[in-house]
Amino acid sequence: MTQAELAPSLNTLDFDKKPEETRVVVAMSGGVDSSVVAGLLKQQGYDVLGITLQLYDHGAAVHRAGSCCAGQDIDDARRVCETLGIPHYVLDYEKRFRETVINPFAESYVAGETPIPCVSCNQTVKFADLLATAKELGADALATGHYIRSGRNPSPENPGRRALFRPADADRDQSYFLFATTQEQIDYLRFPLGGLPKAETRRLAEEMGLVVAKKADSQDICFVPQGKYSDVITKLKPNAALAGEIVHLDGRVLGTHEGILHFTIGQRRGIGIATGEPLYVVFLDARSRRVIVGPKEALETHRVYLRDVNWLGDETLAEAAAGKGFACYAKVRSTRAPAPAVLHIDATGTYVDLTVGEAGIAPGQACALYSAPGDNARVFGGGFIERSEREPSAEACLKALLASPVAA
């Protein structure tokens, strides 16, 4: 099948008017995915505008392989737009990105969490600010290079609305990072790559003659020089590097550390103690600057409590989770397939019971919810993990330890 024959089948955008009468803004990071989106939509006849956000500009991160939305990437996006013959605009969002993504990222680490800055970026800069700009430009849609599908809501209860679904390429599934996308945003957004494998995206980039066809994929934390997030956090929040104790779940002080920012839940290597038994980071007590460690079984988690829940079901969240709860599938890691779970709401909060236990779940991470485990699963939203419950004995030890006084 030729490129011209393939393009119309990839994305009709579901508009009731001709492509040439439809304006689409493409969020262009300077990478291969968003560049191919722009190329496909141009081929289909849409009125395409490319917009790149300058999000940061600090030293090594600008030219680091796998960065995005910095100096070299902006130039790449410009060159792609020249090749395609579409307008390209650059918007300076550096201050906004620092306030809504970088600073909260550092604050989350200080609080003992393991944050996901990509979700914050999608929530604020991309799907709020850029989306608003697209509307101001008279665009009918904002298209991105994310690997996720959207389509008309299959439920008769919500006619005219759109829904999110996992992509065809499960290895590139980005739905975990998009759980917080609101219904209003989903109705306006389009994801042309949802039905494509990554290999086909790169082939199309080569066929289109795009300079970014062989460019490396962006990394999860794009704004961190050399991938050393601790350097960014220490600069913004020096107290995150304050020393503290490494304590066993049973209360024994095993050693000291140089800052909780160097640890994450589930970590085994690099803890800095030798006890003759394998120990893992079980909890980060930010208040007392303690790194709490224990055996692997102390990491086993079957229940996670959520905050800032974004619900995308057809019923209200309260209706869906009433009674015995809402049977669904959940992902607590971006690389895992959705596993059976039940969503509940009661006086203790909103929580998800995981049928299969997970180890190393950290506060600040996400729990995304789905209708099924397969590629065609609908995305029901999700929430940020506020806390998790371990097996009873480990939970009891942790609560006792956190309630005990800490030596000055």
Swiss-Prot record:
Domain of life, per lineage: Bacteria
Protein EC: 2.8.1.13
Molecular function as annotated in GO: ATP binding; tRNA binding; tRNA-uridine 2-sulfurtransferase activity
Sites marked Interaction with tRNA: H146, Q365
Disulfide feature: C121-C222
Catalytic activity field: S-sulfanyl-L-cysteinyl-[protein] + uridine(34) in tRNA + AH2 + ATP = 2-thiouridine(34) in tRNA + L-cysteinyl-[protein] + A + AMP + diphosphate + H(+)
Record key words, sorted: ATP-binding, Cytoplasm, Disulfide bond, Nucleotide-binding, RNA-binding, Transferase, tRNA processing, tRNA-binding
The keyword Transferase appears for this protein: yes
Assigned protein family: Belongs to the MnmA/TRMU family.
Cleavable signal peptide: none
Protein's recorded name: tRNA-specific 2-thiouridylase MnmA
Record-linked InterPro entries: MnmA-like (IPR004506), MnmA-like_C (IPR046885), MnmA-like_central (IPR046884), MnmA-like_central_sf (IPR023382), Rossmann-like_a/b/a_fold (IPR014729)
Pfam families recorded: tRNA_Me_trans (PF03054), tRNA_Me_trans_C (PF20258), tRNA_Me_trans_M (PF20259)
EC top class, as a word: transferase
Region (Interaction with tRNA), start-end ranges: 172-174
Locations listed in the record: Cytoplasm
Listed GO CC annotations: cytoplasm
Principal place of residence: cytoplasm
Function: Catalyzes the 2-thiolation of uridine at the wobble position (U34) of tRNA, leading to the formation of s(2)U34.
Binding-site list for ATP: A27, M28, S29, G30, G31, V32, D33, S34, L53, G145
One example of a Gene Ontology biological process annotation: tRNA wobble position uridine thiolation
Active-site residues per Swiss-Prot or TrEMBL entry: C121, C222
